[in-house]
Amino acid sequence: MKLSVLSVLLVSVAQAAAAPWRPREPRAAGSKRLTFNETVISAALSPSSISVQWIATENDGDYVYQEEDGSIKIESIVTNRSQTIVPAEKIPADAYSYWISPDLSAVLWATNYTKQYRHSFFADYYIQDVETLETVPLVEDMVGDIQYAEWSPSGDSIAFVRGNNLWTWSDGTVTAITKDGGPDMFHGVPDWIYEEEILGDRFALWFSPDSELLAFLTFNETGVPTFTVQYFMDNQEIAPPYPRELDIRYPKVSETNPTVKLNILQLSDNTVSTIPIDVFDPSELIVGEVAWVTDTHTELAVKAFNRVQDESKVVIVETASGETKIAHERDGTDGWLDNLLSISYVGPLALGSGDASSAYYVDLSDHSGWTHLYLFSTSGGDPIPLTEGEWEVTSIVSIDQERELVYYLSTQHHSTERHLYSVSYRTFEITPLVDDTVEAYWSVSFSAKAGYYILTYAGPSVPYQELYSVNQTAPLRTLTSNAALIEKLEEYALPNISYFELEIPSGEKLNVMQRLPVGFSPDKKYPVLFTPYGGPGAQEVSKRWQSLDFNAYIASDPELEYVTWTVDNRGTGYRGREFRSLVAKQLGKLEAEDQVYAAKQAAKLDWVDSEHIAIWGWSYGGYLTGKVLETDSGAFSLGLLTAPVSDWRLYDSMYTERYMKTLSTNAEGYNTTAIRHTDGFKNVEGGFLIQHGTGDDNVHFQNAAALGDTLIGNGVTPEKMQVQWFTDSDHSIRYNGGNVFLYRQLAQRLYKEKNRAKKEQHQWSKRSQDWVV
């Protein structure tokens, strides 16, 4: 493609975004530049926001919140009146989190917190009476070993998990529901892979709306291979003689997965029934979602997937009889099926040919080619579309049964944006709740009865929050204005952000976000850093407020002044099923091609220093960086790989097989997607850096170790290769100051790359105060 054609293309920018070769002036008029401390270490220049725990009371709009002094209050967001229910001096010591009972009579406190995996943690739990303020332990002999606890909707009982067994508490009486829980058997909480890849949370139990029944999953890890993570320091100042070893049942590609069973507990007599979900072979079954589709306890929906997640079946359980039926099926063998966790009950309806007594729920599906809202009957039959078009619904945010409305967020204006709408499941009328002709990224939180909502403008400008009633269009009041931040930012000269679409040779258009350095001049030459994530269904290019983070820092530091390009390659999200599914069975191939193509187009711009174009990614982005270097394209001069996957055989089965299928059916695909060709690593002018935490339970350090061995064994020289491990750090790399060190190292490598062949050193001493932690 000729530069003139590229220029014409880049004019087709998302609305109000400036063309990249004619950048807007910085939004702030000051002269200060962002520093390392302000962007990486401190959050002083971050927008503030409020989030509330809505509660169902006689008056819709009540919520619970915690004051800065620690006291717990109930406040009406409508009247602004508040009531203290637990004063600060009565808060339990070492409190981590709290949940008020639905009847407002007690508070459940989690204390003595210990992190486990991404979502899960261990804690002690206490119940505090709101009237007397007396606090009693949930279990007398607890030692920071309770995994999860949850109030019933009626507020008179608690289900909790300890030692991988399910227990109940009711009026001070604790009852063991299961007794065979242990290292290989999980009741009511997910094992590692279900927490990380399927449920995305730390619980696997669900009370019925009337508190009569409790559905819960049981995971059996017998036969699942074990991966051992070593902790060399184990939070001690001096290393113990032997590392602590954590054995995790971690199924990798084509290895044995945990089996899963659905159980229903009758809370009145503590009897448990196991409900067979036999729509797939037990060794192949994945339970992706469990949701009550009733106002009482009559029906339960279970979304089941096959092992490689390209077939799904929604099973309806009739709880009185224990009978099951398949209500809906989906074939996604043209790619994969995402587990969107979006089943939402709406109630009994008489629509079309549906049974008048049938219950309905809404769910998201992309069977039309785009993810949209559909109305499903629990009796089966064809779903009824509520939305349609070449755009996608991204989330269901509330169901208003009284007004018969579904509230949702979608990309109707542009895939990088989110706007709020309602649709009637009676008349099918769609109503925007925001001006959907203006570029914006909105999020929302509805009250318990959906009569009020907090609307958050999340970008592209400085965020703010307003309170609305569904009965009027004007806001009731502003909750968060971030006026102080706006005033503070006027002291700064900020990097300039714009958005545009880049057409690739195959005809698809890629979303690109560009950040130009402070004081940008088209008469100068600037180094460029590409910052992809690029994973299936992911999105990095959005019109959210872009945090003043490391990328903003390297665009502000006068000794760095990097342009950054973030390119959402083929396979990323919110562009339709066809765009997503292009990468099926061949991860890393098209994604790398797209990043290379974008870099070559950037290199043609007059103000780009084409000899210094770097790429940096974390996790999937680190893997993609490796695949880009492997192409040996010459488009990039430096590669920075943080916590990368290097071979999909080394990653977990449920994520990898969703996109790559099994080894037996796609052996060649696994061979080509692994990072094994080393010429590109030998030839990249500025070399490359690999960073990884040794305590990473997600993307194991094994990936970096194996990649390093491949590179060394194939003759990559020390001048090209730098490797940095972070002792005991997990995937976020934060242990013992690791995060700050990581970003310092990245900044130094970028400085070295910018000045490659100049043999200069970054003069950190000029701004020594900038490195104070």
UniProtKB/Swiss-Prot annotation:
Residues 1-18 form the signal peptide. It is found in: Secreted. Glycans are attached at N37, N80, N112, N220, N471, N496, N671. One of its GO terms (biological process) is proteolysis. Keywords: Aminopeptidase, Glycoprotein, Hydrolase, Protease, Secreted, Serine protease, Signal. The active site is at S619 (charge relay system), D696 (charge relay system), H731 (charge relay system). One of its GO terms (cellular component) is plasma membrane. Its EC number is 3.4.14.5. The keyword Protease applies. The keyword Coiled coil does not apply. SUPFAM superfamilies: alpha/beta-Hydrolases, DPP6 N-terminal domain-like. One of its GO terms (molecular function) is aminopeptidase activity. This is Probable dipeptidyl peptidase 4. It comes from Emericella nidulans (strain FGSC A4 / ATCC 38163 / CBS 112.46 / NRRL 194 / M139) (Aspergillus nidulans).
